[in-house]
UniProtKB/Swiss-Prot annotation:
Gene3D superfamilies: NADH Oxidase
Domain of life the protein comes from: Bacteria
Sequence positions that bind FMN: 18-22, 46, 95, 153
Any GO molecular function: nucleotide binding
UniProt entry tagged with the keyword NADP: yes
Protein known as: 5,6-dimethylbenzimidazole synthase
Pfam families from the UniProt entry: Nitroreductase
């Protein structure tokens, strides 16, 4: 298929309005929309076609509450690295949507999946994690569904694995919060908050 300028423009807009958000409305997401997000993840490439990502949809309020407690403990521990004005700024940042997002996914990487028969990963096992990252970033079409997504990284991964009773060969990668944003913005939250501005990607040539 050859794509036209209208396709390119539409994709650029979806990517620009990436909606990496932390503030969600509680509106439930239609199951048909969730099915489309899953289908887009299924289209992702992976090393050796191993498809190492594993996803647990977490609907239980009790489990979400425990993950939020995990976050609060990890956030407090991480905050000890900052002092003065930076510590004050850190305290004001909203770094999770666990308390609001209607759809929450725990994403894991299978450390040694049978699929793919080891192709392409013997010398670079990290390609399994890279494949998982490509899979859940494919859900970037969420902006096209008028949804936002926030990845929560301030967590104790081993505690999440225990909490969700993940198999021992699954490594926790990401906690994804998905829902309709409270507001839309094409500027990353940390840039707007003054914590870290968006920087251009540096390319070098050899």
């Amino acid at each position: 298929m050859n794509f036209e300028q209208t396709h390119r423009d539409a994709l650029t807009e979806v990517l620009r309005w990436r909606r990496d958000v932390r503030h969600f409305r509680p509106d439930p997401i239609d199951e048909a929309v969730i099915d489309r997000l899953r289908a887009v993840m299924d289209m992702a490439p992976s090393v050796g076609n191993a498809r190492p990502w594993r996803v647990i949809r977490v609907d239980s309020p009790a489990l979400r509450a425990e993950v939020l407690a995990n976050f609060n403990a990890a956030r407090a521990a991480a905050g000890s690295a900052y002092a003065g004005e930076q510590a004050e700024a850190y305290a004001t940042l909203k770094l999770q949507g666990i308390d609001q997002a209607p759809l929450q996914l725990a994403v894991f990487t299978h450390r040694d999946p049978a699929a793919g028969h080891g192709l392409g990963r013997a010398s670079m096992p990290v390609t399994l994690q890279q494949s998982t990252a490509m899979a859940f970033t494919r859900s970037g079409c969420r902006a096209g569904e008028n949804l936002g997504l926030g990845m929560v990284s301030v967590l104790d991964p081993k505690a999440v694995e225990r909490l969700l009773n993940a198999p021992p060969d699954w490594d926790f990668v990401a906690w994804l919060c998905i829902g309709v944003p409270e507001f839309t913005d094409d500027t990353p939250l940390l840039h707007r908050a003054g914590w870290q501005e968006n920087l251009p990607t540096e390319w070098e040539r050899r």
